[in-house]
Structures are given as structure tokens and as C-alpha cells.
UniProtKB/Swiss-Prot annotation:
NCBIfam families: glyS_dimeric (TIGR00389), PRK04173.1 (NF003211). This is Glycine--tRNA ligase. GO terms for cellular component: cytoplasm. Homodimer. Its main location: cytoplasm.
């Protein structure tokens, strides 16, 4: 199946099965804003859990924080965001729709293999295909404003954070002292960020409200390049370990002229989304932010954010390596890469098309489905009891509606690794049938061994 059609199919599946809904749909919705349904919440939490385990709890040199969405306004002035967190905005004179000029230029270069000789004049209107007629680019702030207090005035002006990183930097000294950490060490944060995107879109890929998984790793100057490469490799491998096909991933080195104001070097992990105007899209960025952030916040706040190395007697401002991932983008990648269609036998002796999400078991929203073969009390009673017992350990779904094959299909398309069928033989042999999602193989497991069997199969879940 072509990748673009996979996007459309996955979007349809997400809406139909309750992973993602359009925000405020009964009122017409908000463009590129999404609510996460019951299964979507579970998938998101599982992704966050795996990220946190890998980046924080499995390491002795990283700790976590949860910082405020609304920071003092001076944080964003000092960091440079108020001045430079802008995008070039242009308007089509054909449709009067607005676009980011850099996105138009990048899409042209990716399609043609070279930048447009005459700049925007060579770029056709994306909607109508007419020869390009554009306004002059204007700076457009990506910061979302809000006001604190009873009056909407300059004194109450604040910003919703466009990244979680600054909350980490301003807490650097607090964390270092209270946790008795010293470089090299990291501080991680998962939370909501907000950006006033000009052209949000592509499902949950680019939205104005999004969730980030970021870690700032503080190192001694001179050791930054080695640590940067370490985190590039580690983050790339994380996606592969959770089931993403490495052929669908690539590393993209930012050209020097396109680096952010704080960056010495940035490498993106990109995924082959195959959007209409671009094959590759950023999944995660790993940046060498140098000592920029701690240095400017030391100057702006008057607080010394340097580190005194007792072993060498030197004082220095740490460099920062930042792996920054978007949770929505990660979720989109895991869904697209897990989506498969194959065939499965039906009750009539033929075969049906089967949609299956071959999600890594650690990510699957539901781990086990308990399915009584019949609604009769002699089966439904023990099945309900079994489901209640298994819920103490995993997210379990209980389903009695429809033929057993149809119920298997429902679980396959949401990625449930195991279906446990309670049948009439269970009443005689105290065993159940366990079906594995990907192979569709079925084995008989005694009830008193079921929990242990599933625990072995669901390690890390």
C-alpha cells in the first residue's frame, strides 16, 4: 500500500476506533486540533512510559521535572524567543491564504532537487496551481500570548511556552543542588507546548498545541561533540527497538545557515511520511545548544548557573545536548509503521481481509482481550472473573458481541497482542485458548498458569 494511502487509512482508523477525534467536532471543530480518545490516551501513555524508562529511570545520570506552562515573561525575552521565534509569512494573491515562505521553498527544493532560481516567483500556488504571486515575507511570531490578572495590558502579558526546555534551564541549579547531580547529567520533561503555527496540518503532525518529550543533557565543554553523537545514535535506535522499520528512518543534518540561534549542530531523525509535498518529515531533533541557554539566563537573571569542577578546580558553564521529540509525531509514526493488511480464515471456510496493527507489545493500548465463546452465564461468569483478575496487571478488554472471528478482527486492528477465549472446554479442563495477534497461532494454557504465561510475553509492559 502506498504510504500516502496509509496516512489516510490510519487517520480513518484513528477516528473510527477512538484513538483520535477532531477537537470540538459538534461545533465544527478547530483546524488541526485533536482530542485523544480512550485508545489514543493509552497509546500516548505507553509511548511516554517507554520514553521515560529509557531516558530517565533506566539511567543513573538523568532525573525528571515537570515545569510550568506559563513561565515569567523575562524567560522568553532572555532566551531570544521574543525576538527571533518568528517565521516568514507570505500570502497568495490568488487565494489570500497564508503560508510559511521557508516551507514553500523547502518543498520546492525537495521536489526538484534544487532551490527555485527566482525564489517564491517560481513556486505555484499550492491550492490552485497558478503561477506564484506572493506578498513580501513578513515576520510572524510563533509565540502564543496570554494575560494574567484582571486587565489585558503589558504588565499581565505572558506567553504559553513554545518548548519545555526553558523550564529545565531555569531549574538547572535547583535540580543540580537538590539531586546532588554533576555534569554529565540530564534533566527530562514531558509536557504540553504551544506554537502559533501558520500552516498546521497533516493530521497530528503539526498542531498548535502539542506534547513534547525533551531532555537537556549538561556536559563539560569539549565533550559536547562526543555526547551529541551518543544521543543521536541512542535516539535513532529507540525507534527501531520499538518496531519502526529502519528503512523508513533517516538522519538529516541541518545546514549551517539554517541552524537555530542557539545551535552549534542539529541532526533530525526523519520518517518517510510521504506527505503530499514532502517525503520526509521531522520526528525528533537532537541539538548541540552549546552554553547558550545557561549563559544568557545567568546574564539575564543575575544568578550564577556555572558549575565548579572540584577535581580540576575549574569553573565552566555546561554545554547542552538536547534530544527533543514530539509525542504526536511519534504516535503517528508507530501507527503508520505498524499498519498491515493480510488475510485470515473466516467461519465459512474462506478468507477475509485482516487489518492488524503490529505494534510493539509495550505500546499496544490493550494488552489482552478476554472473549467468552458464548454469552451463556456458565461462560460469561468465569470470563468476567478472569478479566477482572488480569486487569490488576494490564489494560484488558472484555468483548461478548459477535462471532469469535469478528471479535478477533476488532482486536487485531487496535493492536491487542493476545486474545484469551473462554469456551465450553474450559469448564472441563480449566484451560483457555490464547491467540497471538501477528501469527494468529493458538495454544491452550491452564488457567492457573495464564497470568505467568502472559507476564512472560508482556515483559516491559
Amino acid at each position: 500500500m502506498a504510504q500516502q494511502s496509509i496516512i489516510d487509512t490510519v487517520v480513518n482508523l484513528c477516528k473510527r476506533r477512538g484513538l483520535v477525534y477532531p477537537c470540538g467536532e459538534i461545533y465544527g471543530g478547530t483546524r488541526s486540533a485533536w482530542d485523544y480518545g480512550p485508545l489514543g490516551v493509552e497509546l500516548k501513555e505507553n509511548i511516554k512510559r517507554q520514553w521515560w524508562r529509557t531516558m530517565v529511570t533506566s539511567r543513573p545520570d538523568v532525573v525528571g521535572v515537570d515545569t510550568s506552562v506559563i513561565l515569567p515573561r523575562q524567560v522568553w525575552v532572555t532566551s531570544g524567543h521574543v525576538e527571533v521565534f518568528t517565521d516568514p509569512l507570505v500570502e497568495s494573491l490568488h487565494t489570500h491564504k497564508r503560508y510559511r515562505a521557508d516551507h514553500l521553498l523547502e518543498a520546492y527544493e525537495e521536489k526538484h532537487g534544487h532551490p527555485p532560481a527566482n525564489g517564491l516567483a517560481d513556486i505555484n500556488d499550492p491550492e490552485t496551481g497558478q503561477p506564484g504571486k506572493w506578498t513580501e515575507p513578513k515576520a510572524f511570531s510563533g509565540l502564543l500570548k496570554t494575560f494574567l490578572g484582571p486587565v489585558d495590558d503589558e504588565e499581565g502579558l505572558h506567553y504559553l511556552r513554545p518548548e519545555t526546555a526553558q523550564g529545565i534551564f531555569v531549574n538547572f541549579k535547583n535540580v543540580m543542588n537538590s539531586s546532588r547531580m554533576k555534569p554529565p547529567f540530564g534533566i527530562a520533561n514531558i509536557g504540553k507546548s504551544f506554537r502559533n503555527e501558520i500552516t498546521p496540518g497533516n493530521f497530528i503532525f503539526r498542531t498548535r498545541e502539542f506534547e513534547q518529550m525533551e531532555m537537556e543533557f549538561f556536559v563539560k565543554p569539549g565533550e559536547d561533540e562526543e555526547w551529541h553523537q551518543h544521543w543521536i545514535d541512542a535516539r535513532h535506535q529507540w525507534y527501531i527497538d520499538l518496531g519502526v522499520n529502519p528503512d523508513n528512518l533517516r538522519l538529516y543534518e541541518h545546514p549551517q545557515e539554517k541552524l537555530s540561534h542557539y545551535s552549534k549542530r542539529t541532526v533530525d531523525i526523519e520518517y518517510a511520511f510521504n506527505f503530499a509535498n514532502s517525503k520526509w518529515g521531522e520526528l525528533e531533533g537532537i541539538a548541540n545548544r552549546t552554553d547558550y541557554d545557561l549563559r544568557v539566563h545567568s546574564e539575564g537573571s543575575g544568578e550564577d548557573l556555572s558549575y565548579f569542577d572540584q577535581e580540576t578546580g575549574e569553573r565552566w558553564i555546561p554545554y547542552v545536548i538536547e534530544p527533543a521529540a514530539g509525542l504526536g509525531r511519534a504516535m503517528m509514526v508507530f501507527l503508520m509503521d505498524a499498519y498491515h493488511e493480510d488475510e485470515a480464515p473466516n467461519s465459512k471456510g474462506g478468507v477475509d481481509k485482516r487489518v492488524v496493527l503490529k505494534l510493539d507489545r509495550r505500546l499496544a493500548p490493550v494488552k489482552v482481550a478476554v472473549l467468552p465463546l458464548s454469552k451463556k452465564p456458565e461462560l460469561s461468569g468465569p470470563a468476567e472473573k478472569l478479566a477482572a483478575e488480569l486487569r490488576q496487571f494490564w489494560n484488558v478488554e472484555y468483548d461478548t458481541s459477535g462471532a469469535i472471528g469478528r471479535r478477533y478482527r476488532r482486536q487485531d486492528e487496535i493492536g491487542t497482542p493476545f486474545c484469551v477465549t473462554v469456551d465450553f472446554d474450559t469448564l472441563e479442563d480449566n484451560a483457555v485458548t490464547v491467540r497471538e495477534r501477528d501469527t494468529m497461532e493458538q495454544i491452550r494454557v491452564p488457567l492457573d498458569e495464564l497470568q505467568g504465561y502472559l507476564a512472560q510475553q508482556l515483559i516491559g509492559c
